[in-house]
């Protein structure tokens, strides 16, 4: 006779990149134009050690794998100078007549110590139920993120979709990410 097996308490189906927010020392800003976030765990491995005597395995120590952080690839559908400023540093140029209008961006000079800011990245995805209704949002927070220098390409007949590479590494005693469920998305304001 089969034993009683418990059913999982939660079966959470999430979809879409609904919102991405960046938390810096100056506050939090968000953008809803990203359409892809790929996360690659960064690991360090120590090889397994096996004791084989005359063709017989006598003992073995298994391979050890240590998670050291995550490499995040964020694909956005528009160029966001404020995001790039956080990722790699540099300077945003504003119009003198309209002080909130961005008229340019200059990256840090080659060899500069300007590397952007350390930040938290929050990625929100929607959770739907069987009726097609959003029931809540999944928020994954990655700590201690830093961007890598950004490059741009263009192609005839295609809008540019910049890819940003971000490295996240937890501090000692800190988790590499945290998942929370929230009833609604933060509201983007001016």
Segments predicted by a language model, with ranges:
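Solvent-exposed edge beta-strands and adjacent loop segments
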Residues: 2-89, 144-158
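Extracellular-facing segments of soluble proteins and assemblies that are Gly/Ser/Thr-biased and enriched
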Residues: 65-122
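Mixed-charge, glycine-accented linear interaction segment located at domain edges/termini
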Residues: 136-190
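Short acidic DE-rich linear segments
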Residues: 2, 104-107, 185-190
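Exposed beta-sheet edge/beta-hairpin loop segments within beta-rich domains
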Residues: 64-65, 108-113, 131-134, 150-161
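Short, surface-exposed beta-strand/loop "edge" segments at domain boundaries and coil↔beta transitions
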Residues: 27-30, 81-83, 125-137, 174-177
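A general secondary-structure signal for short beta-strands and their flanking turns/coil
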Residues: 15, 67-71, 116-120, 135, ...
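Extended, acidic-biased charged interface segments
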Residues: 114-143, 171
């Amino acid at each position: 006779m089969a034993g009683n097996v418990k059913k999982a308490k939660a079966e959470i189906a999430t979809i879409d990149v609904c919102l991405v927010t960046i938390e810096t020392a100056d506050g939090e800003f968000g953008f809803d134009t990203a359409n892809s976030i790929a996360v690659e765990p960064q690991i360090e491995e120590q090889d397994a050690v096996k004791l084989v005597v005359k063709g017989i395995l006598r003992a073995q120590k298994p391979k050890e794998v240590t998670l050291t952080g995550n490499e995040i690839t964020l694909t956005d559908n528009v160029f966001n100078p404020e995001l790039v400023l956080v990722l790699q540093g540099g300077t945003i140029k504003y119009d003198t007549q309209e002080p909130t209008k961005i008229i340019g961006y200059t990256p840090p000079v080659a060899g500069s110590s300007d590397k952007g800011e350390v930040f938290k990245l929050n990625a929100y995805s929607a959770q739907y139920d069987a009726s097609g209704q959003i029931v809540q949002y999944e928020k994954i927070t990655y700590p201690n993120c830093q961007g890598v220098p950004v490059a741009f390409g263009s192609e005839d007949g295609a809008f540019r979709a910049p890819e940003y590479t971000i490295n996240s590494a937890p501090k000692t005693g800190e988790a590499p990410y945290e998942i929370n469920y929230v009833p609604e998305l933060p509201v983007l304001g001016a």
